[in-house]
């Protein structure tokens, strides 16, 4: 009777009325305290009996099913759910990567054709390939019981895209922000890897922000000369052990994954290492260079060291920058373009900055032991959209953050006011 009566709701009710030893505790992230909870002990429990069901109805004020469904929607993400979400986003990233690689292997040479222009960015044909893969994947793979709103460049001027299709945004449980291809120009010129970036957060409407992201995955789209594609993922509160790094050989149809080791540098200074402030475009180069010069002068220049051996690497993808910090390649990377362009009063350069979808995998860096914050040290709390400018600084470890942060603040204040 019990098994017949409640199979569809069994898993959800266990979180509410399951084992007495199932404790819930808040989880903090560098993006601020996030309103998520981890299920610290999950063990088999029996199916809910009729008495327990009626008790639940009493809690809901006898308003089944509408109130019960609302309660089901508001149940916080536990560890099992987080891991499931991780696997789903890893599958999504692999799907987009494979679609782009397959199209490239056909010998197509029109990746650089402009397909459209949005407030967030210019959309190229290669972006449309990835977007088609996204929609197909969500139709086929995303759990029907997890209604989700999608946010990615190309649809910001359209009504909210949700899955299952047609679900009102107000009825969704999650918000998934995606950068289908971070580094489109890298792929167009076959210059450097691009990345598929995705982050999942509990739905809070327009209040959902970067600090709410609970699962993040980044998947490498390699150049035509490169056989290996890395994929990194993390869940909130998992720490370094919860960061999963794998690689596949994209030359063969069988995508066999193998673990790889990705560790941030343990350096305590930037000498003889890589550290950069972003300046991809002519706009703002002079101001950014002044800030950087003052920074290194204060930290490292002296009579005994008239030349400062700190190198820079202008990787034009935010995903690639984060990967550099996580993989031990870089000590510090800062993207202060929104501050510089504001000083220049250059409104037309608004699209030439980092946006939330670019930095949505910052959780992987912080769970790896790195630091990600605003230039003034605040947590990143920009809304999960495709147009809000984001200024950020990433450090490979806490020691580097403590050394560089005060000097960087002073340099920014002296140059930009």
Residue ranges and their predicted role:
Residues 169-237:
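DPxDG-like acidic metal-binding loop motif
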Residues 89, 93-96, 100, 167, ...:
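An extended, acidic
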Residues 64-181, 399-400, 405, 409, ...:
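N-terminal subdomain of lithium-sensitive/metallo-dependent phosphomonoesterases centered on the IMPase/IPPase/PAP
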